[in-house]
């Protein structure tokens, strides 16, 4: 489990420093949902298994787990394959118990284009507009206190 977390961190850091984030909407969608040959990618069985292990580990340790989808631009959301959205929603709901595992899906939050750095990342303006909503939600769930 620790090796998996280290690998994920290494991959995320590498992507940030090599510029493998951002780009045009076409580039972003292709990177997230299609392989090099243009074939559609679903979450892998490995990803699904690791999610299950994370949920189990959090429950064992009596930790709250928040499965979270950040706000994205309308254009981005329109391009996400519906089968991907349905599968990720289904996987998340499979684990939600509203006591320790929560699913916060903010992809439908409507923010103006001025709030986005690119199609799937908020900029500073967006962060300042969105953070109070997230804080209120976490407070209502009892995950954080005011």
Spans of model-derived segments:
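Active-site segments of SGNH/GDSL-like serine hydrolases
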Residues: 55-80
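Generic detector of short, locally flexible boundary/turn motifs and exposed helical patches
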Residues: 29-34, 68-71, 92
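Long, positively charged, glycine-interspersed low-complexity recognition regions
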Residues: 77-146
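Membrane-targeting and insertion segments and their boundary/processing signals
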Residues: 24-28, 62, 66, 100-108
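Secreted/periplasmic serine-hydrolase-like ester/acetyl group-modifying domain
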Residues: 1-61
